[in-house]
Structure formats: structure tokens, C-alpha cells
Design a protein with these regions (language model features):
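Catalytic cores and adjacent flexible loops of soluble metabolic enzymes
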Residues: 1-299
Length: 299
């Protein structure tokens, strides 16, 4: 049997400066800006810069407006930030962002613990955000799309129904997130069979299946992926949750498959090692340390 052809190109949104750093001890704004510049210099054209959240709740995201102002408009680059509520969305509008991400969960218990709202309340808030004047495109990131540590499996039909409700609320795009690392290639296929492939994928390496799941989604026809430089990330509401798939590891796979990303992997590895210097510990990305398979040993 001949496998269907892979997409010729994918769009990667690097979330390292927000999702990657939010679980770390705070680093100076100047270092966050330097990291973003390094990621952009590698050719990344879609990047999550910060989150408009309370600095008391998430100290590592203090200074979001300062970070965004320092980056400014970039031709061909989509700059996004996480907004947890209407006030955060208003701040994002004032900052002139190209996109905002909102968080939502397919797990009722996780949603309650994360944003202190029911699923219906979250959908109502997302609708409010989407109806704001001058709101940029909204990407609704649905956590626990492939399972919850509280309820267990989430039925693919329920995930598909929530995608419909999110789009009805005004979301421009929907991204399916494997927040707790419960996805498998089989479950990826089962969900995509009902949601269709016009979704993004946000995958974690909690159980070491992140890249396998990304490849399964790619084979199904998905072309939008979140990943984090150096493989940082996690969730304070999911015990043991590991980082996102590392951008440089996913790019290394895609390069070998002949799938275009527009990203220079060696420059991206430089950004990953910058992260390591800033946080003061070894980052989980294996490609950041071993390099891509195309790298040759020095004589």
C-alpha cells in the first residue's frame, strides 16, 4: 500500500518565549527579547511572545508589553500572545499583535482548575473576546484534546463538537493540545478523522511520544504545529507534564522528510543553547546538543 504524500510545507509556531519560559524561574526581559530575536533570526515566522497574565500568578511573564514593544512589527512574521480573559485581550489589541491565543480545555476538571470556569463559561468568555473591536485573529488552544489525567479518555466526538462550538464563538483557528502527554498516534488519527486536518497541533513529550504524534498528524495532513525551542514547557495544572516537542527536533525530522519549514536548524540550535545559558541548566532537546544528522564531526 502506498502512503499518501506528505504536505510539502508546514507552519511552525514557536512557543518557547511563552509556554517554554512560563514554568521557569523569571529571567530578565532583556534576555527574553534576545531569545525571541534569536528564534526569529533562525527563520521562524510565527512566534508566541508572551502572556498577558497577572505577574503575581505567573512571575516569568511580567513585562509582556515591554517584550512585545521591543519586537515590534516584522514583515512576514505573525506575533501572538496568550490572553486569559477580556482584559488581556484588550491589552493585546493595544500592543498591536497579529494574533491572540486563548486557552480552553476539553476536560471539564482541567478547565476548572486552570481557568476557574466551566466549559460553557469559557466558551462565553471566548465569544466576548472574539467580538471585541479590532481583535486580531484568535486561535483557541484546546488542552487535553487526547485525554485528561482527571477524566481519562476524551471521546473524539466530544473534541470535534467542541471545535465546532469554538468556531461558532468566533475563533479563527483551533489548535488541539496534548497538555498531559496522553496522545498516541492512534488517538491522533481517531480525533483528526472527526475534526478534519484544518487544526493546529500542540504536543508534549511527557511520555516520549511527542514526535511520533507530530509525524502521525503530518501524515494525516496537518500543516500547523506548535513547538518550543529547546523543548521547554509544561503545565502547573498537570503533574509530571513535560515540555513541548522541541522546535529543532521537529525541524530536523521535517528537513529529512523534505518538508519545508523555512527554518535554519543550526541557527535554531544557537537559540536553544541561548535558552540553556539563560536558565542555567541543560535543556531537554537532544538535537540541541547532538546537532542534526547532517552535521559532520570536525576533523
Amino acid at each position: 500500500m502506498t502512503a499518501p504524500p506528505l504536505p510539502t510545507a508546514v507552519r511552525i509556531r514557536d512557543v518557547g518565549a511563552r509556554d517554554g519560559l512560563q514554568a521557569e524561574s523569571p529571567i530578565p526581559v532583556a534576555q527574553r527579547i534576545a531569545l525571541i530575536e534569536a528564534i526569529l533570526a533562525a527563520g521562524v515566522t510565527h512566534i508566541e511572545l508572551a502572556a498577558f497574565v497577572s505577574p503575581k500568578a505567573v512571575p516569568s511573564m511580567a513585562g509582556a508589553a515591554e517584550v512585545i514593544a521591543a519586537i515590534g512589527l516584522r514583515a512576514g512574521v505573525v506575533r501572538t500572545a496568550l490572553v486569559p480573559n477580556v482584559r488581556g485581550a484588550q491589552m493585546a489589541i493595544e500592543a498591536g499583535l497579529d494574533e491572540v491565543t486563548v486557552i480552553f480545555s476539553a476536560s471539564a476538571v482541567y478547565n476548572e482548575r486552570n481557568v476557574k470556569m466551566s466549559i460553557d463559561q469559557s466558551l462565553a468568555q471566548i465569544e466576548q473576546i472574539c467580538s471585541l473591536d479590532e481583535i486580531p485573529p484568535v486561535d483557541a488552544v484546546m488542552s487535553c484534546s487526547f485525554g485528561s489525567p482527571y477524566e481519562g479518555d476524551i471521546a473524539p466526538a466530544d473534541v470535534a463538537a467542541l471545535c465546532v462550538r469554538l468556531r461558532s464563538a468566533g475563533a479563527t483557528n483551533v489548535t488541539l493540545a496534548d497538555t498531559t502527554g496522553m496522545a498516541t498516534p492512534r488517538r491522533i488519527g481517531e480525533v483528526l478523522e472527526l475534526t478534519g486536518t484544518d487544526v493546529g497541533m500542540h504536543l508534549h513529550e511527557t511520555r516520549g511520544t511527542g514526535l511520533l504524534n507530530a509525524f502521525a498528524a503530518l501524515q494525516a495532513g496537518v500543516t500547523r504545529f506548535d513547538s518550543s525551542v529547546a523543548g521547554l514547557g509544561g503545565s502547573p495544572f498537570a503533574a509530571g507534564a513535560a515540555g513541548n516537542i522541541a522546535t529543532e527536533e521537529w525541524v530536523a525530522v521535517l528537513d529529512d522528510l523534505g518538508v519545508s519549514t523555512g527554518i535554519d536548524i543550526e541557527r535554531l540550535i544557537e537559540a536553544a543553547m541561548l535558552v540553556e545559558a539563560f536558565i542555567g541548566r541543560r535543556v531537554p532537546s537532544r538535537v540541541a546538543h547532538a546537532g542534526p544528522r547532517s552535521r559532520r564531526a570536525s576533523s
